[in-house]
């Protein structure tokens, strides 16, 4: 047990060292393993024939199953040539040809028969021009009969793109798509023989597994093995990623189990490309290092951001503490608020010294809009003479009272103060505030429309003279004479 346990590690370095020297290719396919699988499948098919009493002439097809590492993004159709033909002489082959100009369908058929006889081709059983295909095989049942009556279809390369719309989906579902051939080539016999004797690999987007026809049970074993090896070599040349894209190979018949022939024995496609294990480890280590470096950088950036935030929060606290000892514990204020308070305090002093009893001075913070609201309120009060039942003389009295209300604003600077400098300051501040408030509107200010209406009504009422009631003398009643 100890010896068996010690053997695998000793062999592992040899295998790892041998992988780069022997790149992956069709040479890795073991012909002896393929031969054993083919013999087992032939024995199985013979036993089935004897058990079911089938005809001896009936042959089953051999298939090579190919499993790829990745599902291709596009459908592929690869033509592969084989050293030994997989179709017997009894196979029925159909050829679709182009319509020749100024010739009928029968004449075109005769023309291509002569062409094939001149090149010594006798494997094609029927020729169908494109015009007859459109007319005679338009119905669904006719297409099915055409599909079942032939084993293989060939078409002229000039009309290949026109066939799918006329053949239908059943040709493509049953993998009997016509193979294109150049009928104008000088080596026409070689092309047609390769096409009939060869095979086609259809790789679909729906899965990674596809099958290739490589022979039948009536062929000798060695011919089937040679066909398998030839297909493996052509796969290594025509697949998108060469031999690296091949994962598994199986051999099977139509009604048998698939037997494995080749396996790449790798866990990923990167290892199939012949990369060394050391190189893979280096790549993994580089990636891990980069990830760790990025994580460390992110952590450092987060720490720096936290420190900056803490410093920004702690900045205002030391500034207040530093200012307090300089003042000696006495709180100080900024010069700007002192000027404002001084300006505001000057107004009440002027109000106290004023001789008028009605204080109409407006503070600095208050805009002249507030004063206008007061005047408008007084004006609204004056507008009530329509409602008052008194005579028109009462209106004149109320009109006389309005200038008395507005006079104190004009007489504001006349109030005695403590000094002439203070009066001048008060005037300048009031004028500045008024000028600044002209451009800005106070949301509390009432609209100016009623004010204009009041003055218009007042002017109109001033122009009109007061009307006095004149009583006409009543006629004395004359007593009626009786």
Curated annotation (Swiss-Prot):
Q: Which residues carry this modification: Phosphothreonine?
A: 367, 407, 415, 457
SUPFAM superfamilies, per database record: Ribosomal protein L1
User: Sites of the modification Phosphoserine?
Assistant: 354, 384, 388, 461
What Gene Ontology terms describe what this protein does at the molecular function level?
mRNA 3'-UTR binding; mRNA 5'-UTR binding; RNA binding
Coiled-coil parts of chain: 284-315
Chain intervals with Low complexity compositional bias: 1-20, 309-327
One Pfam family, short name: Ribosomal_L1
User: Oligomeric state and partners?
Assistant: Interacts with ING1. Interacts with KPNA7 and KPNA2.
Stated role: Regulates cellular senescence through inhibition of PTEN translation. Acts as a pro-apoptotic regulator in response to DNA damage.
Family the UniProt entry places it in:
Belongs to the universal ribosomal protein uL1 family. Highly divergent.
**UniProt name for this protein:** Ribosomal L1 domain-containing protein 1
What is the native source organism of this protein? Bos taurus (Bovine)
**Highest classification ranks of the organism:** Eukaryota, Metazoa, Chordata, Craniata, Vertebrata
């Amino acid at each position: 047990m100890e010896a068996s346990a010690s053997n695998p590690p000793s062999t592992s370095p040899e295998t790892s060292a041998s992988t780069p020297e022997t790149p992956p290719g069709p040479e890795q396919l073991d012909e002896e393993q393929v031969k054993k699988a083919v013999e087992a499948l032939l024995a199985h098919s013979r036993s089935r024939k004897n058990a079911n009493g089938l005809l001896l002439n009936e042959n089953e097809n051999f298939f090579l199953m190919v499993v790829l590492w990745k599902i291709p993004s596009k459908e592929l159709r690869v033509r592969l040539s084989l050293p030994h033909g997989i179709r017997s002489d009894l196979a029925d082959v159909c050829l679709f040809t182009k319509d020749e100009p100024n010739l009928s369908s029968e004449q075109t058929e005769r023309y291509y028969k002569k062409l094939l006889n001149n090149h010594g081709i006798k494997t094609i059983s029927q020729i169908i021009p494109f015009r007859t295909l459109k007319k005679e095989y338009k119905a669904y049942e006719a297409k099915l009969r055409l599909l079942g009556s032939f084993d293989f279809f060939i078409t002229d390369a000039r009309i290949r793109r026109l066939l799918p719309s006329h053949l239908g989906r059943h040709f493509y579902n049953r993998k009997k798509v016509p193979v294109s051939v150049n009928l104008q080539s000088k080596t026409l016999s070689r092309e047609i023989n390769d096409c009939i004797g060869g095979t086609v690999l259809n790789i679909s987007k729906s899965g990674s597994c596809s099958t290739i026809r490589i022979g039948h049970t009536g062929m000798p074993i060695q011919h089937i093995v040679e066909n398998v090896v030839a297909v493996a070599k052509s796969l290594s040349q025509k697949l998108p990623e060469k031999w690296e894209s091949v994962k598994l190979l199986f051999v099977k018949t139509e009604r048998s189990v698939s037997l494995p022939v080749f396996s790449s024995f790798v866990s990923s496609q990167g290892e199939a490309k012949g990369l060394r294990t050391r190189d893979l480890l280096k790549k993994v280590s580089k990636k891990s290092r980069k990830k760790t470096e990025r994580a460390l950088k992110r952590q450092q950036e987060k720490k720096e951001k936290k420190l900056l935030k803490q410093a920004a929060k702690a900045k205002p606290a030391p500034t207040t503490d530093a200012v307090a000892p300089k003042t000696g514990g006495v709180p100080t204020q900024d010069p700007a608020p002192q000027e404002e308070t001084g300006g505001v305090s000057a107004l009440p002093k002027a109000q106290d010294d004023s001789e008028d009893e009605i204080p109409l001075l407006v503070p600095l913070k208050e805009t002249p809009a507030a004063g206008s609201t007061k005047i408008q309120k007084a004006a609204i009060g004056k507008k009530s003479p329509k409602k008052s039942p008194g005579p028109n003389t009462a209106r004149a009295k109320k009109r006389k009272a309005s200038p008395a209300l507005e006079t104190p604003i004009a007489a504001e600077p006349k109030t005695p103060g403590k000094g002439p400098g203070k009066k001048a300051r008060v005037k300048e501040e009031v004028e500045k505030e008024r000028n600044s408030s002209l451009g800005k509107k106070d949301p509390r200010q009432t609209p100016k429309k009623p004010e204009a209406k009041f003055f218009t009504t007042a002017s109109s009422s001033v122009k009109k003279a007061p009307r006095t009631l004149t009583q006409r003398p009543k006629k004395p009643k004359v007593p009626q004479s009786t």
